[in-house]
Amino acid sequence: MSIAVELRHISKRFPGVVANKDVSLKVETGSVHALVGENGAGKSTVMKILYGMQRPDGGEILVNGKQISFKSPYESIAAGIGMVHQHFMLADNFTVLENIILGDEPTHARQIDFKAARIKINEMSKLYGLEVDPDELVENLGVGQRQRVEILKVLYRGANILIFDEPTAVLVPQEVDELFSALHGLREKGMSIIFISHKLDEVLRVADEVTVIRRSEEHTSELQSRLHLVCRLLLEKK
């Protein structure tokens, strides 16, 4: 299987803190790859580097086999990478449609082509099982529905590599089930997914591969049995 994303020896330092030390991982195309570790281990930092929000102090990033150095999220988005943040970045007083197309509005005759946007959003919603009402104000949506809007935002921009940063932190159990169903659907459509979490039970439910980060260092990125992973994490915590 081809490799969608490869990080080689990524390091990142802040004043007095080593956030990432020699972190490497490979994400296969069409898989869910979990990035696991305790709070403060450096999981989100390495993904912010991949997304262009921060620059690494060392290491290489390869996307679909091509070495890339992202200077901003715009460059990462252009390369087909999207990030669903833990804290949603939505305008409450805008509709679902307006939020999804914001900054990437289709135009016709120098005006926003809302008809074309609506058609595209409805098609994506059905294709990926992310049903939304394009005309509903975001302020009227529940947390799980808002997350769907965030996912559709990155898909609308052409992402085929999706980063989910602690996506279940604000969800109730039913919404977690719905999210995992959506993740499986995205994977079946060939999307590559990076799932950041510190919740082991959720990782075992959704992930095909796992990379463990402890105290800023990557300890394993190979495909392994779920039982092996559980034992390893439990032993290292003692």
Where are these regions (language model features)?
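Single conserved hydrophobic/aromatic residue that forms the stacking wall/gate
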Residues: E218-K238
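Glycine-rich phosphate-binding loops of nucleotide-dependent enzymes
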Residues: M1-E217, S221
